[in-house]
Design a protein with these regions (language model features):
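Core segments of alpha-helical transmembrane spans in multipass integral membrane proteins
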Residues: 16-20, 40-62, 75-85
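Membrane-water interface at the C-terminal end of transmembrane alpha helices
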Residues: 108-129
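Cytosolic, membrane-interface loops and tails of multi-pass inner-membrane proteins
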Residues: 29-35, 126-133
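Juxtamembrane helix-break-helix junctions at the cytosolic face
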Residues: 57-70, 91-92
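Residues within membrane-spanning alpha-helices of integral membrane proteins
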Residues: 7, 11, 48, 73, ...
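Membrane-helix boundary elements
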Residues: 3-6, 14-41
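Membrane-helix boundary connector in multi-pass membrane proteins
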Residues: 85-102
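Membrane-embedded alpha-helical segments of multi-pass transporters/permeases
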Residues: 22, 59, 88, 112-116
Length: 133
């Protein structure tokens, strides 16, 4: 595993989550224990497009960041950490629950750890191009 792969995993997961939020909005929100309304579906679909966009940015960052990839890895780790903080807040206040919330929490913690670990590697040990894999 390398930092480029972590970016691809993060990007892929965000694109899949975004697609589910965009095309199966009611099911996704309902599985998190939310009361689905037409207004919430609109917000959920907006989240879906945003998640797809973040996934695309993450996927492409590993190709275009070059030697700055570790710095971007730290930034994306912080982005994922913000999502974890929000999930924990929603759990504590009872605004969301159910298996999807816990799955997102565990996956998010793993991603933060991977971004942190691989961003801390020596620049010489970070695989940046496909030729080096």
């Amino acid at each position: 595993m390398n930092l480029k792969l972590v970016f691809r995993i993060f990007g892929g997961l965000n694109m899949v989550t975004g697609a589910v939020a965009l095309f199966a909005t009611s099911e996704m929100l309902g599985s998190a224990g939310m009361t689905v309304t037409p207004q919430l579906i609109t917000v959920g679909q907006g989240f879906g497009v945003t998640a797809i966009a973040l996934g695309l940015v993450s996927w492409r960052t590993s190709d275009i960041a070059g030697e700055s990839l570790p710095a971007y890895g730290q930034l994306f780790g912080i982005v994922q950490l913000l999502q974890i903080v929000l999930i924990v807040y929603h759990l504590m206040t009872g605004q969301a629950g159910g298996p999807p919330v816990y799955i997102n929490l565990v996956v998010g913690i793993v991603l933060v750890a991977l971004f942190y670990f691989y961003s801390q590697q020596d620049d010489n040990s970070v695989i940046i191009s496909d030729d080096e894999e």
